[in-house]
């Protein structure tokens, strides 16, 4: 199997996985985060959140300096020591937030789709929606390559909206609480593969990878991991992978950071 000592990368979703979906608590995972940090194992956060939000969380969690995947893979924040890589400190995949916003405004105006984006409201409203402080809510609006929205139309109209976005080279992705529009070329899996390849190029050896997630939008990330933890989540659809070999995939009984801890216990403590 694998051990905490060998070259290893841990990729983790945030809301509903490392963070509690409601309280944003992460303390049940704290002992494992400390052990991984002491073993120099990078814990690479992957989320629909903005890089500004995630850099704040990195500091809170004691994970500064390592790369992270923001906006569902449309943004890669590079590791501090990767300053020689083109694009430092961030790599943007596909078209910009501003360009996507223009597309959405046109679709809403001409085809009358009903939705509310984070750009339509102020930080106080987002704080009410999310339970975040206003200062943290302000960070959620600093998108660089995606748009976050609340869908307010029918399922039939959603199918039409998704089709129109696909025609325009965009994708519509469901997150833990909100929907996200980003370039069709972007994804957590592509971003993770790029980071893995970069670590391999720098060290001369491909690291073993472990991924943790709780929602359907985490499936592409977990598919490209060597080992995966599917944290019990609130989403009705759940997470379904092509390869669910029990030697590779563990489904937790607990939710959020307690499930995160359970997954690490399964793959490391028992061996």
From Swiss-Prot:
Keywords from the named record: Cytoplasm, Hydrolase, Magnesium, Metal-binding
This protein's GO CC annotations: cytosol
Reaction(s) catalysed (UniProt annotation): 2-O-(alpha-D-mannosyl)-3-phosphoglycerate + H2O = (2R)-2-O-(alpha-D-mannosyl)-glycerate + phosphate
Cell compartment(s), UniProt: Cytoplasm
Gene Ontology biological-process entries: mannosylglycerate biosynthetic process
Single GO term (MF): mannosyl-3-phosphoglycerate phosphatase activity
Main location group: cytoplasm
SUPFAM superfamilies recorded: HAD-like
Enzyme Commission code: 3.1.3.70
Active site positions, chain numbering: 13 (nucleophile)
Domain of life: Bacteria
Cytoplasm in keyword set: yes
Positions of Mg(2+) binding: 13, 15, 214
CDD domains in alphabetical order: HAD_Pase
Annotated disulfide bonds: none
Cofactors named for this entry: Mg(2+)
Family affiliation: Belongs to the HAD-like hydrolase superfamily. MPGP family.
NCBIfam families noted in UniProt: HAD-SF-IIB, HAD-SF-IIB-MPGP, MPGP_rel, PRK03669.1
PANTHER family: HAD SUPERFAMILY HYDROLASE-LIKE, TYPE 3, PHOSPHOSERINE PHOSPHATASE
HAMAP family attached to this UniProt entry: MPGP_rel
Protein name: Mannosyl-3-phosphoglycerate phosphatase
